[in-house]
Each structure stands twice: as C-alpha cells, then as structure tokens.
Amino acid sequence: MSSRPSEPALSVTPRIGYVVGRLDRAIRREISALVAPFGLTVPKYTALSILRDRPGLSNAQLARRCYVTPQSMNEVLIALEADGLIVRSPAANHGRVVEVTLSERGREVLAACDRAVTHMENAMLADLDDAGRKQLLDALVGCVYRLGAGFGPR
C-alpha cells in the first residue's frame, strides 16, 4: 500500500478572502446536507430563515436579502408554498405586492433545520469560547458592512 505524500507546508499565509471563500463553500456543503432530509436546499433554508426574522417581505425584498434575482426567488417561493412552508398574501397597502410569511409547518421545519445547523456551527467553533465566538462574529459582520453587503441598518 502506498502512502500519500504529505502536503508541503505553506510558505506564505493564505489571504483572508481565500480562507473565507473556502469556509463559505464548506459551510454551504454542510448546510446542504443537513437541510436536504427536510426537503430543503440552501436557498430555501436561507429564505425561510430571513422570513422568520422579517415576516411579510415581498418577493423582491426577499430576493435582495438572499442575493438572488426576483425570478430565482419566485421559483424558490413557488416550491416553498407547494410544500406548505410559506403563505403568500396580498399586501394591505399595495395591491400588486405579495407579502410572504412562514406557515406553522414552515416554522417547525425551520426550527428542526436550525437545530442541525447550530450543532454543525458548534462543532466548527469548538475551539472558541463565548468571547472568542463573539469577537469572530463581530469581526466578520464588520467586514460585511465595510464591503457594502450589510444586513440592513447597523
């Protein structure tokens, strides 16, 4: 049996953007595997998560927060509605706008997915205490805002 040669030590420190990109892909892969048993994809899980925190968003508002086109978000919403996870209803103040909220089943599925994702995040951050986790989160959120991709008013 041949052994695989060890990888050479890095001669330079990797760029933070590269490491964050690798982490993003790894997290997406893990979340995809965790939510699939519930019939969700990462975009569906993301949409449900945002709707939990901001019920009543329109398709266009939700698309902006999920970084997808309104057309792509509409496809996600059609699937979520067919699965009974969301409710779409006309906005009270605008006849053409449709507001989206979670159904009771949507809240239950999201809670189950959140438990699985929290477990994964806890494993990923096992070497950090609460203060270290807060410091990491604050630094990452700051980076997001400085690049103009914030989560809304800070």
Language-model-detected regions and their locations in the chain:
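Short helix-capping/turn signature of helix-turn-helix
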Residues: 51-54, 68, 143
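Central "turn" residue of the DNA-binding helix-turn-helix
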Residues: 39, 55-56, 67, 129
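N-terminal leader segment of winged-helix/HTH proteins
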Residues: 1-38, 131, 154
